[in-house]
Amino acid sequence: MALNLKINRQIRAPKVRLIGSSGEQLGILNTKDALDLAREADLDLVEVASNSEPPVCKIMDYGKYRYDLTKKEKDSKKAQHQVRIKEVKLKPNIDEGDFSTKLKQARAFIEKGNKVKITCMFRGRELAYPEHGHRVVQKMSQGLEDIGFMESEPKLNGRSLICVMAPGTVKTKKKQDKINAQDEKQ
């Protein structure tokens, strides 16, 4: 985070519009007088608006101001949750034990709040029977429908059948669709 604010002796303007530490307007003063007021209050003189005439300066604790800004920035980064897309790869002729392992893996991803991309890969002549892949993907989505919903229907893309599951329930998806429909009307 780069703060390009001038403080104390870095302020070169002859006169400044001064704002006190509690936010009250103190008027236009010589920079030297403003610095003396800030020093008396044991605070810093910070130039907050350099593009106005005369520049606007505020009496504040600059170290605390920077600390608060960095803390707010960190808190806002923590609040953001980046949804990642995890992938689970299957084959159309997957065995039951392997399928249950992949289902547990996909369930863990969704419970952590990630989306899951289910990919059923066809090899050789398996592409002649895409219904086998559809059946495996459908079985996987049914196993996850209590904690997630199918965000995109299964699509054949080259030699792969792909669909995306998102965390939440069908009710959540219906609510989101309803909100989107209302937004489109407006």
From Swiss-Prot:
<dbReference type="InterPro" id="IPR019814">
    <property type="entry name" value="Translation_initiation_fac_3_N"/>
</dbReference>
<comment type="function">
    <text>IF-3 binds to the 30S ribosomal subunit and shifts the equilibrium between 70S ribosomes and their 50S and 30S subunits in favor of the free subunits, thus enhancing the availability of 30S subunits on which protein synthesis initiation begins.</text>
</comment>
<dbReference type="GO" id="GO:0016020">
    <property type="term" value="C:membrane"/>
</dbReference>
<keyword id="KW-0963">Cytoplasm</keyword>
<keyword id="KW-0648">Protein biosynthesis</keyword>
<dbReference type="InterPro" id="IPR036788">
    <property type="entry name" value="T_IF-3_C_sf"/>
</dbReference>
<comment type="subunit">
    <text>Monomer.</text>
</comment>
<dbReference type="InterPro" id="IPR001288">
    <property type="entry name" value="Translation_initiation_fac_3"/>
</dbReference>
<dbReference type="GO" id="GO:0032790">
    <property type="term" value="P:ribosome disassembly"/>
</dbReference>
<dbReference type="InterPro" id="IPR019813">
    <property type="entry name" value="Translation_initiation_fac3_CS"/>
</dbReference>
<comment type="similarity">
    <text>Belongs to the IF-3 family.</text>
</comment>
<dbReference type="InterPro" id="IPR036787">
    <property type="entry name" value="T_IF-3_N_sf"/>
</dbReference>
<dbReference type="GO" id="GO:0043022">
    <property type="term" value="F:ribosome binding"/>
</dbReference>
<dbReference type="GO" id="GO:0003743">
    <property type="term" value="F:translation initiation factor activity"/>
</dbReference>
<dbReference type="Pfam" id="PF00707">
    <property type="entry name" value="IF3_C"/>
</dbReference>
<keyword id="KW-0396">Initiation factor</keyword>
<dbReference type="GO" id="GO:0005829">
    <property type="term" value="C:cytosol"/>
</dbReference>
<dbReference type="Pfam" id="PF05198">
    <property type="entry name" value="IF3_N"/>
</dbReference>
<dbReference type="InterPro" id="IPR019815">
    <property type="entry name" value="Translation_initiation_fac_3_C"/>
</dbReference>
<protein>
    <recommendedName>
        <fullName>Translation initiation factor IF-3</fullName>
    </recommendedName>
</protein>
